[in-house]
Amino acid sequence: MTKRSKGANEDKLIETKSKNVSGKSQKQKKPVEAESLKEEDLLQASGTDSDYDGDSLPGSLNSDDFDSDFSDSEDDGTHEGTEDGDVEFSDDDDVLEHDGSIDNEDDDGSEHVGSDNNEEHGSDEDSERGEAVEESDSSEDEVPSRNTVGNVPLKWYEDEKHIGYDLTGKKITKKEKQDKLDSFLATIDDSKTWRKIYDEYNDEDVELTKEESKIVQRILKGEAPHADFDPYAPYVEWFKHDDAIHPLSSAPEPKRRFIPSKWEAKKVVKIVRAIRKGWIKFDKPEEEPNVYLLWGDDSTSDQKSKHLTYIPPPKLKLPGHDESYNPSLEYIPTEEEKASYELMFEEDRPKFIPTRFTSLRSIPAYENALKESFERCLDLYLCPRVRKKRINIDPESLKPKLPSRKDLRPYPNSCYLEYKGHTGAVTSISTDSSGEWIASGSTDGSVRMWEVETGRCLKVWQFDEAIMCVAWNPLSRLPVLAVAMGRDLFFLNTELGTDEEQEITKERLHSGNIPEPDASVAAIVTWLPDELYGGIKIRHFKSISSIDWHRKGDYLSTVMASGETRGVVLHQLSKQKTQRLPFKIRGLPVCTLFHPSLSYFFVATRKDVRVYNLLKPGEATKKLETGLREISSMAIHPGGDNLIVGSKEGKMCWFDMDLSSKPYKTLKNHPKDITNVAVHRSYPLFASCSEDSTAYVFHGMVYNDLNQNPLIVPLEILRGHSSKGGVLDCKFHPRQPWLFTAGADSIIKLYCH
């Protein structure tokens, strides 16, 4: 080991103690006497500022000096300075040996003085240490204060000639104060006066460096003092949320967590002993009074017996928008309205008329302020106040207790099959009595017959006009399909059934025995043979909007947009004749229905529904008041005592005709028009379809007990058709809890449970 490396190691140890040396001993250091070079020349050679004081411990180094000046050199044994490269050292040069100079001062106070090179090297170390002190962020590395008086108020030295004492114990005298004129001229002559700060503690002017002024500017802007500080540094997650393989602490659970506490047991024993000896006494429960007022309210009687009840006065009404100094235009009355106020009685006249002002300061004093205050005082003084008890009712108790949907199964809730083939919107569908076949009509002029289970199209009839309505004959032995389009009504032979049924059907549809109609009927309808498909065609004087079969399959009703007795006519297929209704219809008819078991006939107009008896035309009719804007469809329960009416405002009414002529329930479920409603023949189900492309399925149970009201429970919302046009028709399967829907997207869908 060379002398240089040995001295470097010792200087590294001395570096850690350099700060403590100045704080403990505070011994006065003697300047190192240079033989050939001055201190300023050494500082210039080392590349540091000349104003550095140069006080340092000879022989002590910091980490930067150790790395730069005393690192291992190359094979040639030479080393160059890292900063300027001006000072070079070689192995042949004299090196300061630290064997005897680790302690900077001897007992007699003399110092070890090295050679010229050592002095130059020591001054270089001092200058670099000064740079390290300036760059340090620690408050311990700051230049110590001259004044050693401590943290005391300077008011104590106001009357003295000095402000404290320096390190040697000498008084620090105050500077002579300049006149204001001299100080002003000095500030004008000095261009750096804005960077100077007066330190009253040391009685001197301190000039801020550029770095310090930048720090002040950052603090004024609310930024971090140091430019290198990153306030948005990436967050280091010490503990991640992911499950680790090893636990943070795998110490075993202590035994005290598995055994009962000994000290708690002692406390319990102490409390039990005190209870047994009677040291701890419990409060006896207060006995409730058994006396009460027979005809009075207990709560108010208790309050009146104790003290006079105070009822706070009612609060004043808060001002509204009309009392604003700049209200909206709709609150300001016109001249005509103001004139009408003058004609009113004083009691009916509004107490305040809104007025507009340009600003808040232009508002005058309120004229009726004193009058209203006086009237309120009279009301509070003369009018008695009564406390009214509010009835607290749980809102949940007001809701009807409906059964769970799981208990009401089966009902259609999912799409099972789609029937595709039409090119236009499907306007109407109908199922036969057996449930094996379904017929559909579309705006493309085609009528299709489908097999329900497979979705296979069995037959197609093509017409020139859009199909409005199709209806299958309810008798299974008469497979006839009624089709309405424009002004014509066709009876088509579906060619289903046995040979005997086909013979009966062909006889019914034979047009050779058509009788001559009456004169009153001839102006309305005309029976004609269907040359295209071999059936019968009935031509009406107006377009047909709805048709409905009688339960026996012989009569068929058609609805046209006409008033009085011409809007609804009845056709008899067996005799091939038409008859008008024996009563007048008030309003334009929308749709008609036959009663499922009696001889009643339902006619729905735009506002209400009227019930007629076909066997007794002179009997008074029954009128059902719907309260709807316009009726769109109607369906009757198989029992015949309940009627469902749909409207074009999205509402659906349930009528219990034995109960009242007004709706028992009104359901607002669709946001758009309801196109049709349907009731199942055997299951307690009914449904509605709308232009919003949805179909609602409900549970509607009708009880035989007349004292029990029908139960209506919403079950399912069926979606699946496109939003354009919505769902135009819906029908239930006659035997299964299935629902068919016809959409404007030319698709028929089957929903099953």
Swiss-Prot record:
Q: What is its main location?
A: nucleus
Q: Which SMART domains match?
A: BOP1NT, WD40
Question: Positions of the region Disordered?
Answer: 1-155
Keywords noted in UniProt: Nucleus, Repeat, Ribosome biogenesis, rRNA processing, WD repeat
**Which ranges does the UniProt record give for the WD repeats?**
421-462, 464-502, 539-581, 626-665, 669-708, 722-753
This protein's source sits in the domain of life called Eukaryota
According to its UniProt entry, the function of this protein is described as: Required for maturation of ribosomal RNAs and formation of the large ribosomal subunit. Plays an essential role in cell growth and survival through its regulation of ribosome biogenesis and mitotic progression.
Which gene codes for it?
A: BOP1
> What's this protein's name?
Ribosome biogenesis protein BOP1 homolog
Q: Summarize the subunit comment.
A: Interacts with PES. Interacts with WDR12.
Q: Which GO terms describe its biological process?
A: gamete generation; maturation of 5.8S rRNA from tricistronic rRNA transcript (SSU-rRNA, 5.8S rRNA, LSU-rRNA); maturation of LSU-rRNA from tricistronic rRNA transcript (SSU-rRNA, 5.8S rRNA, LSU-rRNA); regulation of cell division
User: Spans of biased composition, class Basic and acidic residues?
Assistant: 7-18, 30-41, 110-121
Q: Residue spans with biased composition (Acidic residues)?
A: 64-75, 83-109, 122-142
> Which family is this sequence assigned to?
Belongs to the WD repeat BOP1/ERB1 family.
List the source organism: Arabidopsis thaliana
Which compartments is it annotated to reside in? Nucleus, Nucleolus; Nucleus, Nucleoplasm
A Pfam family matched in the record: BOP1NT
Which Gene Ontology cellular-component terms appear in the entry?
A: nucleolus; nucleoplasm; preribosome, large subunit precursor
Q: Which InterPro entries match?
A: BOP1/Erb1, BOP1_N_dom, WD40/YVTN_repeat-like_dom_sf, WD40_repeat_CS, WD40_repeat_dom_sf, WD40_rpt
Describe the inactivation phenotype. Embryonic lethality when homozygous.
Enumerate the HAMAP family for this protein. Answer: BOP1 (MF_03027)
Gene Ontology terms for molecular function: ribonucleoprotein complex binding
